[in-house]
Amino acid sequence: MAANISIPEFYNGQSIFLTGGTGFIGKVLVEKLLRSCPGIENVYMLCRSKKGKNINERFEEITSSPVFNLLREQNPQALNKIILIEGDIAMLEMGISKTDQEILKDKVTIVMHSAATVSFTEPLKVAVNTNLRSVRELICLAKDMKNLQSFVHISTAFANWFELNVKEEVYPSIYDPDDIIELANRLPDETLNKITPIFLGKHVNTYTFTKSLAENLVKREKNLPTIIIKPSMVGASVSEPHVGWIDSLMGPARYIYYTTQGIFRSVYLPNRSAAIDFVPVDFTTNLTIAAPWKCEIDKRTNSSMTYPYIYFSATGSVNQLLWKDYFKNSRDFGRTIPPKNAIWYPQIRLHKTKIGHHIDVALTHFIPAYLNDLVAKIKGQKAIFDE
């Protein structure tokens, strides 16, 4: 392979196996791959039945999303390159049939593992099976792929958030990932939930705990061409597939949405100079696509490469946005271009003390919400904030 080959040229004839293709990052990743790398052979996308819809119904729903509008305009036939693989990452062997496993082993050249549960309150067993065991199952499958060039695992920049200066490396865990997987699936749920805080240690939730362990799983596979992508909080796009595109109220988008609506009015922010670290989704997906290209070029020029390649997709100390400015900008945006369903005039107060914040929440969140729902019930209307 020539050292000056372009990224689209690199993807000519490649077959991708993608997990998490139905999620926020996954949809943008699929769209970008099919639109910018038209020579791709196929994208095998893991998908499960959900909420009474089978995988084909979910596929129709997902591909009708506005995220694919530009692709449909430029190259509508590209969507035919998506081949659904029924499965569930939380299951053993990811719930993939033996027949489909053989297809993947024979055809796939690049694995992109984006699927995860990003809930901070997930029980340990659920988080382990979804974020950790799935990586082990996928690695086992990837080892038998005849033409594998890259194994890309999307982790998080916060996997070891408690380290003072986080470097592009995998930090060793005091636990063996296999032991945690066995323990989580052997102990009764009640017992496991009681001892979860002991295992978490410095980790504040099961999300970062399992993500850190998953990185250790990837690192130990010395003979696999592994890549770890570590995004911080992922927000709306800068330009692709559309300016400001987002379809999820996770992370930073949630704060913007509720602040502009006038619902979110008080924030506990003891450190006014604290920076918020989040990146546009198209930055993260572009990095995910470019990383296998870089890995393959390096393999051609360096016979002593060490894996995994690790890339952060984060702001860090460059072009920082402070939390205080983030909330004020959201407030000002809501005042300038108010949403149609705004509840109240946008206002936000930043508190250095918890007591001040709690008082403000009671006065501007709970009491108004209760009165609003009370009036709605009297009128025979549906309460909005009851939940």
Regions found by a protein language model. Name each.
Residues 105, 110-114, 121-129, 133-209, ...:
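Conserved Rossmann-fold NAD(P)-dependent oxidoreductase catalytic core, especially the SDR/UDP-sugar
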Residues 291-387:
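Mid/C-terminal beta-alpha module of Rossmann-like enzyme folds, strongest
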Residues 130, 276-279, 321:
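Residue-level signal for the nucleotide or nucleotide-sugar donor/cofactor binding architecture
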